[in-house]
Amino acid sequence: MNQSTLSDAQKIYYTRQPKKRRSWVSFILTLIAMVLTAMAAYSMYRDPLFTSSFLNQAVNYHQFQHFTQQLGNQGLIDVSNFEEELSRLLSMINIFFVLCCVNITLAILTLVFNRTLLKILNFIVSLGVLLIPVILLFIIRDAATQLASALEPLQALVGNIEATSLLAESNAVHNAIIYTGIAAFLYLISLFFRNRKIGTRL
């Protein structure tokens, strides 16, 4: 008798509070955005971060520290300001990897639990992920300017040196901006596709 009464109460509850059906459009958009974020992180890890025509070298994440040591070991010019810029660059890249991990984790939680709050938080994080490679562009260009200033005493020997030939952003930064930009846009669009209510049933 109690089971029958409980069953009737449950039916009344579900009649008043109809279930919601998952938005598959939002699910697919979130999944694609998550993959793009992972691709951006992989590109920043594997592809060249910047190139130096003057040193005839392309530098990826693994070669970053060795590149800094090469410049620090030479005694011809003072590159302390340039090394500070590279340290700032490395810190931003590490933050980028952390935010990508947070973004991917939130995306997985969104795919599983499908909560609007998770979508909003993930969109905010995705904006931070997008902002970092854009900032890296300015850091790399500023570092190139610092290095060009340090090389001014040697211009009589090597001639005029353009900052872009000393240091220029490469594939990893460009790819990260493209991938994270598209991902942030997809996360934004997914916010407009909410769960739909299923017709009331007894």
List the predicted regions and their residue ranges.
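Alpha-helical transmembrane segments and their immediate interhelical/interface regions
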Residues: 2-29, 79-112, 174
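Cytosolic juxtamembrane helix and N-cap/initiation of the first transmembrane helix
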Residues: 2-59, 187-202
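Hydrophobic transmembrane signal anchors and adjacent membrane-proximal interface regions, especially
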Residues: 20, 50-52, 69, 97, ...
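Signature of small four-pass
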Residues: 26-41, 92-140, 187-194
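Long, glycine/tryptophan/cysteine-rich extracytoplasmic
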Residues: 40-91, 143-171
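Alpha-helical transmembrane segments of multi-pass integral membrane proteins
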Residues: 130-202
